[in-house]
Amino acid sequence: AADPAGLYGTVAKLTIRNASPGRCELRPFQISPEGPAASGVFGEQWCWFSHYFPRDWVIDHPRGADGDASYLVPHARELVLQFHESPDVGDAAHYPSLQMYVYGERMCMALTYDTTATSPNTSAGRVPNLQVLSSWPLVRGRWIDWVVRLKVSYAADGILEVYRDGRLEFAETGVPTFYNDILGGYFRGGLYRYGDAQMPASRTIYHRGFVLGDANSSYEEVAGKPALSRAAIRSIV
């Protein structure tokens, strides 16, 4: 489709209609994890992506236990990025360890992990160590560029950094970021819809794709330009 902002020529137009759950997914080339070491490190990954929410995007005000983390993620309206997993044989299905999603007028980021070998049945609503880490205003009518740096680990040595339009707006180190599984995870993104019959009949966003990197990569390599200086970092509203 033509870029609605008139900046980038042809871009991907992602639409989902009258379904919950619904999916319009971009599957970036999967970087193989470095393999689980004794400490549980699965390797470091970088992910750049850019999306555009149209000006006529209808804000869907959530109904339910607003602010309750256990409610937020399962009832998120639209997911735009996830770091997915491959559960061990005999293990229960997991929520993605990292999710970015629309919730009302906010773009939220949540993390879940499990250091134990057997995770609970998350389909029953038991999400281990779920944290809604941060949120930003949902911007419509403008391209937003994101970069996520993730060191995948179920030990206390993981890394999570999130850049928004070149600014480092969230950083946490020395924390678990994944499940205690044999296989590592992978990025998926696009538009995923969860909710109820009261939601809008269709949803559309525009997307410029993904650039992925491994432990040898950097912000500049995946984003194509340097990050802004730390002095330019804004506080998150």
Task: Tell me what each language-model feature is.
Residues 1-236:
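Low-complexity, Ser/Thr/Pro/Gly-rich disordered linker/stalk regions
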